Structure formats: C-alpha cells, structure tokens
Amino acid sequence: MAKLTKRARLIAEKVEATKLYSVEEAVALLSELSTVKFKESIDVSVNLGVDPRKSDQVVRGSTVLPHGAGKDVRVAVFAQGANAEAAKEAGADVVGFEDLAEQVKAGNLDFDVVIASPDAMRIVGQLGQVLGPRGLMPNPKVGTVTPDVATAVRNAKAGQARYRTDKNGIIHAAVGSIEFAADAIRGNLEALLTDLRRAKPASSKGVYLRKVTLSSTMGPGLQIDLGALNSTK
C-alpha cells in the first residue's frame, strides 16, 4: 500500500466523511488544511434535481457575488460608439470591434470575461471556435450579450459566478478565496443558491437543491448542511 503524504494524512484525520458542515466550520477547516503557497479559491458544487439530457432542464446563468470573487478580472468588450465609451468608463480592460476580433484570431486572449453589445454579435459569432472552448463566448443567458455593456462590465469587475449544469446535473462555481471571512463566503454562497432556486426549471420534479459541497482549489470537499442556509428555506 502506498504511503499517504503528510497533507493526505492530515485530511484523513480532520475530515469527517459523513458530517454535514456549517459554512463557518467548512471555511475554517479548509483554511487549516491549506498548505500551498498560492491563494486558493473556495469552490462550490451544487447537485441539482434536474435531468441535464433534457434541454429544458439545463440551468445556466450568473450571480453577482455581494462580497466579490477575490481576484482581479480582466474584461474585454466588443462594442462601438457610445457603448464603447461607456465600457471604457466602466473599467473594461480591452474595448474594440473589428480590431479586437483580429486580436482574438491572432491568439491574444489576455482576459477572463468577454462582453458584447448585440450589434457586435455578427463579428463575435465568427470567433466561436476560439472563444467557445475557453468558456469566453458571450451569451445573453449569463448577461454577457447586452445593450447595457457598462453594467455588465461593472458586474464582471465586482465578481460574478457563472454557471451551467454539467452532464451530471451539477453546478460548479467559485464563491471567494481562502482569505475570505466565513460570513463573506456564506453571503456569496447564499446569493448563488437564491439565483439557482429562481432558475429552477418548471419541469424539474422532486428535491431541487440536493447537495452542496465546498472545497478549496487543492483541498477536500466538505458537504454543507442545507438546513443552516437561509437561501434553501
């Protein structure tokens, strides 16, 4: 049998596999178990009572995190005229139209979020093979195709969790960093869960929010006690 690393032994000693943790307990334990030299994110996985094989049960959207995401977000905006100026004033890092499309085609993708005004989609639509695989393709369902590009930029800069159910009906999102206080993680998590409840498909039957798990980038997953969350009541 292979020897456990010091970190693996610590996790095995500290984590109770069957326990339902409060957010505060989970954040404290993940912080205690964090031994890496970079700032880990705090991630959440939410198992939803949906059938992802059915198109009307795909849950997709975004949540503005009230306490931010804990990282700097670089935003690119496809817009022209007044929209371009509004995007710049709102803090966009890169703003352009055909010129920005050429940068993308050349592989210059030094940004985390792409926003587009509706009139720019005739150009952005041609970039699907580049932006799509990187999760950067603008989409109206998550608020990144919008006539109000300034608000979209401010939301992205403030910190947003974007999500879409995977093939198993699970949502994955970051809700902060390991340096956040527990109440900030709780606030972000409850904002996300509130939006997920609002996005419940009409055809979804039975229990909708089935399981919530918090983890850090390199840490274990800790199941959260749903009964202790205001957004699940």
UniProtKB/Swiss-Prot annotation:
One of its GO terms (biological process) is regulation of translation. The keyword Repressor applies. InterPro entries: Ribosom_uL1_bac-type (IPR005878), Ribosomal_uL1 (IPR002143), Ribosomal_uL1-like (IPR023674), Ribosomal_uL1/biogenesis (IPR028364), Ribosomal_uL1_3-a/b-sand (IPR016095), Ribosomal_uL1_CS (IPR023673). GO terms for molecular function: rRNA binding; structural constituent of ribosome; tRNA binding. Keywords: Repressor, Ribonucleoprotein, Ribosomal protein, RNA-binding, rRNA-binding, Translation regulation, tRNA-binding. Coiled coil: none annotated. GO terms for cellular component: cytosolic large ribosomal subunit. Belongs to the universal ribosomal protein uL1 family. Binds directly to 23S rRNA. The L1 stalk is quite mobile in the ribosome, and is involved in E site tRNA release. Part of the 50S ribosomal subunit. This is Large ribosomal subunit protein uL1. It comes from Marinomonas sp. (strain MWYL1). The lineage of its organism: Bacteria, Pseudomonadati, Pseudomonadota, Gammaproteobacteria, Oceanospirillales.
